[in-house]
Amino acid sequence: ARHAEELGFSSYWVPDHIILPSTYDTEYPGKGLEDKEPDYLWQMPDPMIALMRAAGATSTLEIGTAVLLAGERHPLHLAKEVASLDSFSKGRFHFGIGAGWCREEAEILGVDFDHRWGQIKEAIKIMQSCWTDPETEFHGKYYDFPAVRCYPKPHQKPNPPVYLPSIIVGGEWSQRVFKRIVEWGDGWLPVVADIDQIAIGMRQMRDLANES
């Protein structure tokens, strides 16, 4: 991270997998020329710890998750981690979140895989309250708890930006992702796309925002 800052890079991003099962049936969506999963999938450090170290070693470098599997962590715990990292880095954190592709991994960690974005939507509501309100109380489908206090609050107000990723499938961007961003996200993380494709996606997302 320090070397990246010295070279003039503006940001530093890390991925996330808490675990991967030793065997699983879900097909990895990012296979390359060798038609197999890359070794780094099994070698990822905890992103929040890695970024805390990166923040301490730098002064201007923006840091972010690309992406953190938000449904695999309890939102109260994650809200505190995000706020702490953003506070210690003086507002340099960007919160990229995803739902994950591996059903077996997600289910081991308590995710309702078929409805994982609904679960994440609840989690984001909880975290946004933790970041802005003196107390947070929630009664939903996936999370249910009485009023609690969660500190510290993040450096960025009202909260670090929440980004959602998407990839092109069949030559088209997912409109469902854009709708989520417009409804409760703060930004977009396009994956494996060229400038022209990104420009098309940005126009589509702006059109949805203008219609809402």
Indicate where each model-derived feature is located:
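Active-site-adjacent structural elements that line small-molecule/cofactor binding pockets in enzymes
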Residues: A1-S212
